[in-house]
């Protein structure tokens, strides 16, 4: 019927507006087919669709949840904040309006002051942080807290816990006042499995950071582009053969 989906994956959801309208004008999708299997959610969505078709302006059912989520930012409308976050953070820009509203309900808003510790090295946490406003310092040397990498607006951090399931590899401190979005691992995994553009942004950033950390700490990011574009992230199980004695190869491998 011409409905577009977010990816070619069998589990991909249809692209929908915040009013559940598909890419086919006038065709709406609610409930399990839209990624919401609970009957109560489907009923709320159906009500919104009927009111929309009737020409009545009503707030989305999730509006109170998002208003509560953004309570620390008084005087700013939900839609304006959602738009600002997606515009400022490339990782989050590939979601549809409906996907992003659900994503933000699962996430937590943090407002940090300069000097606040966001998380510490070796913590057993695996959420991902996105920087909507402000800057943070990543302390990459446990022996010298002044050896840092600065991350600016639009960046994200904490992805190694997501990709490799490891403890935090660095301490991160707010350099100035920050507006951060913290997203749990489950929501991030759902994002990268259903939105190919987000997975590409995440993988590319992870490769850049691993190369800069382990191979080329003093080389500008732009000079590494050709190397990063040719690199891939591979997952191996116990017992899988990585290389064999006598292999002829010009590859470099980084264990993350």
What feature does the model see in each segment?
Residues 1-3, 43-44, 196-197:
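Short, glycine/charged-enriched secondary-structure capping and boundary segments
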Residues 1-37:
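FAD-site-proximal beta/loop scaffold in flavoenzymes
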Residues 3, 27, 32, 36, ...:
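Gly/Ser/Thr-rich helix-start
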Residues 18-20, 41, 193:
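Short secondary-structure transition/capping segments
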Residues 50-256:
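Cytosolic regulatory regions built on CNB/CRP/Popeye-like sensor folds
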């Amino acid at each position: 019927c011409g409905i577009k989906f977010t990816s070619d994956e069998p589990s991909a959801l249809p692209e929908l507006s915040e009013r559940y309208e598909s890419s086919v004008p006038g065709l709406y999708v609610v409930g399990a087919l839209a990624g919401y299997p609970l009957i109560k959610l489907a009923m709320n969505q159906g009500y919104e669709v009927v009111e929309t078709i009737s020409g009545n302006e009503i707030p989305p059912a999730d509006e109170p949840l998002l208003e509560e989520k953004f309570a620390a930012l008084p005087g700013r409308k939900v839609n304006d904040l959602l738009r600002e976050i997606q515009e400022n953070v490339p990782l989050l820009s590939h979601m549809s309006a409906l996907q992003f509203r659900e994503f933000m309900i699962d996430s937590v808003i943090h407002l940090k002051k300069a000097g606040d510790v966001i998380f510490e090295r070796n913590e057993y946490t695996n959420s991902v942080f996105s920087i909507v406003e402000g800057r943070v310092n990543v302390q990459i040397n446990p022996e010298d807290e002044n050896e840092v990498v600065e991350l600016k607006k639009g960046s994200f951090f904490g992805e190694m816990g997501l990709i490799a399931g490891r403890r935090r590899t660095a301490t991160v401190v707010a350099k100035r006042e920050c507006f951060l979005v913290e997203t749990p691992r489950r929501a991030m995994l759902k994002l990268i499995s259903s939105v190919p553009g987000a997975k590409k942004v995440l993988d590319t950033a992870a490769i850049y950071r691993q190369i800069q950390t382990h191979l080329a700490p003093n080389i500008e990011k732009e000079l590494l582009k050709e190397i990063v574009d040719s690199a891939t992230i591979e997952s191996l199980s116990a017992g899988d053969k990585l290389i064999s004695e006598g292999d002829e190869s010009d590859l470099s491998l980084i264990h993350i």
